[in-house]
């Protein structure tokens, strides 16, 4: 499956963001995490 890049909308309960990204519960999009 394709992963979701930065600023892509996402579901925090089913996080499909790319590696190094995390789905923000507040904003509902993929944010970069260090």
UniProtKB/Swiss-Prot annotation:
Molecular function per GO: ion channel inhibitor activity; sodium channel regulator activity; toxin activity
Main localization (coarse): secreted
Keyword Disulfide bond among UniProt keywords: yes
Superkingdom to which the source organism belongs: Eukaryota
Tissue: Expressed by the venom gland.
Disulphide linkage map: 3-18, 10-23, 17-30
One CC-aspect GO term: extracellular region
Record's keyword terms, sorted: Disulfide bond, Ion channel impairing toxin, Knottin, Neurotoxin, Secreted, Toxin, Voltage-gated sodium channel impairing toxin
Matches recorded under InterPro entries: Huwentoxin-1, Huwentoxin_CS1
Subcellular location(s) of the protein: Secreted
Record function comment: Voltage-gated sodium channel Nav1.7/SCN9A inhibitor.
Domain topic, free-text comment: The presence of a 'disulfide through disulfide knot' structurally defines this protein as a knottin.
Assigned protein family: Belongs to the neurotoxin 10 (Hwtx-1) family. 14 (Hntx-1) subfamily.
Name of the protein: Mu-theraphotoxin-CCy1a
């Amino acid at each position: 499956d394709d992963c979701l890049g930065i600023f892509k909308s996402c579901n925090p309960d089913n996080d499909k963001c790319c590696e190094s990204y995390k789905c923000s519960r507040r904003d509902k999009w993929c944010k970069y995490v260090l």
